[in-house]
Amino acid sequence: MKIVVSVENAAAINEVAEYNPTFIEIRLDRMEGDLQDQVRAIREKTDIPLIATLRSRDEGGRFVGDADLWARIVGPIARYVDIVDVEARYRDHAPFIKSQGVQILASLHTNEMPTVPELGRIDEMLRSYGDIPKIVVRPKTREDLFELVLFTHQAQKPICTSIMGAEFRYARAILPLFGSEFTFSHAGAPTAEGQYHIREMRQLADLLK
């Protein structure tokens, strides 16, 4: 199971690195000050692969700018990371970001539960500009969650699927068993509702092997 730990400041890196996650996600939208300097400092502190994310408010983050501002912020930072999360709304800038030598995690977060055909269309759209699609939805029922698990199992790989909210938080540990590329956790302050601490996620991963 590939575990990603989300952080929102450079000071947390030493503590996070002790848990040896597969990736560290830098939540740019939750950081203050000079972002480029902070990301550079994180890069100098660790060899763990980095994901840069500037999450929009509409998809659960704090960034409220337009696509051009998003690109002006993320563009100079891309050189210091390995993967950049690019929401569908910013996809026109994906070729420029990819030209920096990084992979694109093409993402869409919704508070709805799409049907399986809709999930397939979202997957296809995200693959049109990214290397790894990331689809995060909000199941309303167990049947919804079953459909998400089935979709994940049958989808082209790689793919990352997850859920929004705390009601079905256990899906964060289950979906990787059915083919989801990553699961996201925290090491102190959750960056999304329902996230497990990496200690808990490792325990779950070990128990579910």
Curated annotation (Swiss-Prot):
<keyword id="KW-0057">Aromatic amino acid biosynthesis</keyword>
<keyword id="KW-0028">Amino-acid biosynthesis</keyword>
<protein>
    <recommendedName>
        <fullName>3-dehydroquinate dehydratase</fullName>
        <ecNumber>4.2.1.10</ecNumber>
    </recommendedName>
</protein>
<dbReference type="InterPro" id="IPR001381">
    <property type="entry name" value="DHquinase_I"/>
</dbReference>
<dbReference type="Pfam" id="PF01487">
    <property type="entry name" value="DHquinase_I"/>
</dbReference>
<keyword id="KW-0456">Lyase</keyword>
<feature type="active site" description="Proton donor/acceptor">
    <location>
        <position position="109"/>
    </location>
</feature>
<dbReference type="InterPro" id="IPR050146">
    <property type="entry name" value="Type-I_3-dehydroquinase"/>
</dbReference>
<feature type="active site" description="Schiff-base intermediate with substrate">
    <location>
        <position position="134"/>
    </location>
</feature>
<comment type="similarity">
    <text>Belongs to the type-I 3-dehydroquinase family.</text>
</comment>
<feature type="binding site">
    <location>
        <position position="172"/>
    </location>
    <ligand>
        <name>3-dehydroquinate</name>
    </ligand>
</feature>
<dbReference type="GO" id="GO:0009073">
    <property type="term" value="P:aromatic amino acid family biosynthetic process"/>
</dbReference>
<comment type="pathway">
    <text>Metabolic intermediate biosynthesis; chorismate biosynthesis; chorismate from D-erythrose 4-phosphate and phosphoenolpyruvate: step 3/7.</text>
</comment>
<dbReference type="InterPro" id="IPR013785">
    <property type="entry name" value="Aldolase_TIM"/>
</dbReference>
<dbReference type="GO" id="GO:0008652">
    <property type="term" value="P:amino acid biosynthetic process"/>
</dbReference>
<dbReference type="GO" id="GO:0003855">
    <property type="term" value="F:3-dehydroquinate dehydratase activity"/>
</dbReference>
<dbReference type="GO" id="GO:0046279">
    <property type="term" value="P:3,4-dihydroxybenzoate biosynthetic process"/>
</dbReference>
<feature type="binding site">
    <location>
        <position position="191"/>
    </location>
    <ligand>
        <name>3-dehydroquinate</name>
    </ligand>
</feature>
<dbReference type="GO" id="GO:0009423">
    <property type="term" value="P:chorismate biosynthetic process"/>
</dbReference>
<comment type="subunit">
    <text>Homodimer.</text>
</comment>
<keyword id="KW-0704">Schiff base</keyword>
<comment type="function">
    <text>Involved in the third step of the chorismate pathway, which leads to the biosynthesis of aromatic amino acids. Catalyzes the cis-dehydration of 3-dehydroquinate (DHQ) and introduces the first double bond of the aromatic ring to yield 3-dehydroshikimate.</text>
</comment>
<feature type="binding site">
    <location>
        <position position="6"/>
    </location>
    <ligand>
        <name>3-dehydroquinate</name>
    </ligand>
</feature>
<feature type="binding site">
    <location>
        <begin position="25"/>
        <end position="27"/>
    </location>
    <ligand>
        <name>3-dehydroquinate</name>
    </ligand>
</feature>
<feature type="binding site">
    <location>
        <position position="55"/>
    </location>
    <ligand>
        <name>3-dehydroquinate</name>
    </ligand>
</feature>
<feature type="binding site">
    <location>
        <position position="195"/>
    </location>
    <ligand>
        <name>3-dehydroquinate</name>
    </ligand>
</feature>
